[in-house]
Amino acid sequence: MELGLSLGEAMADAGRELVLGLGMGRREEAAEAGRRDHEVRRELEFGSMSSRCGGSSPEPTVRLTLLPMVPGLGLPWPPPPPPSSESRHLEASTRGFDVNRPPSSGGGGGGGGAEEEQDDVAGAALSSSPNNSAGSFPMDDFSGHGLGGNDAAPGGGGGDRSCSRASDEDDGGSARKKLRLSKEQSAFLEESFKEHSTLNPKQKLALAKQLNLRPRQVEVWFQNRRARTKLKQTEVDCEYLKRCCETLTEENRRLQKELAELRALKTVHPFYMHLPATTLSMCPSCERVASNSAPATASSAATSSTAAPPAAPSSGGIAATSSSAAAAAAPDHRPSSFAALFSSPRGFPLSVAPQAQPPTSS
């Protein structure tokens, strides 16, 4: 029997440890914290009543903190939030009327101050307990940040709105609207921009007054117009540079092709040179010899023609004379260049066959 009881207690303790380790006993911990808070408040109220109703030597109040033996949790779960005043009043109403607690209405103003002081002391006691080591500081900080953030957000938003409102008022309007210009205003602004791309304050004021606009609107229009002009010029420059790059690429490709062809010709015909015929000429010494031999040939031809007999020679004598003259003149004829040498036809003398003489009559 004792063995069964001991086993049952061990099982109960093990189950409790398992529940606490998994963080499933938060509701029981909240209930225990509420009970401890109620007991501490009751003790404080009893002590305050005894101090008010007692004699000259009141008994000192002893604060009792009854802490259950709770093993350390395996997981760092956040502590339960401290019970609020509404939950405490609801718990007291469910438990019933407490005869030891004095009515709050009879205390008056002093009772209300004492109750607030007791609530502060109870909150301090709860925050100083070991189970609530973290206390209500994370929640307070979170709520404080939340409230502060909510309070600061409207303030910050109000500051931003006030700044934007001030800037809008400086611009002359409560809300910013896109500037709509008429055709006449646009044309006049374009002409002014062609004359002056930038305006000084006097020109800006005069132009705004003439067009019935604000100076800020004129300044913004000129800024946008300069930006558009710069963008268009950048696009034009980009297109021009792109065309130049394409032209240079084509030229480079053509030069690379020609270079490859020249290298191929150099490797195939290393000793072959294409030279025109006009580059071939005679050396200076040959030219002098040719120029000196030409007058001598002409004088010898004239001498031979004058020395010939007037009698009509026979056919054999004429052929011999012509052949001898041709033989004498042939060595003296020299071309002026190698091109003439190869281009002129060469005449070869034909041998004259001997004619048979007729038989003589006796």
From Swiss-Prot:
A GO CC term assigned to this protein in UniProt: nucleus
Keyword flag Transcription: yes
Tissue: Expressed in stems, leaf sheaths and blades and panicles.
Residues of the signal peptide: none
Biased composition (Low complexity): 64-75
Gene from which this protein is expressed: HOX11
Family of this protein: Belongs to the HD-ZIP homeobox family. Class II subfamily.
UniProt keyword Nucleus present: yes
DNA-binding segment(s): 174-233
Ranges of biased composition (kind: Polar residues): 126-135
Species of provenance: Oryza sativa subsp. japonica
Protein name: Homeobox-leucine zipper protein HOX11
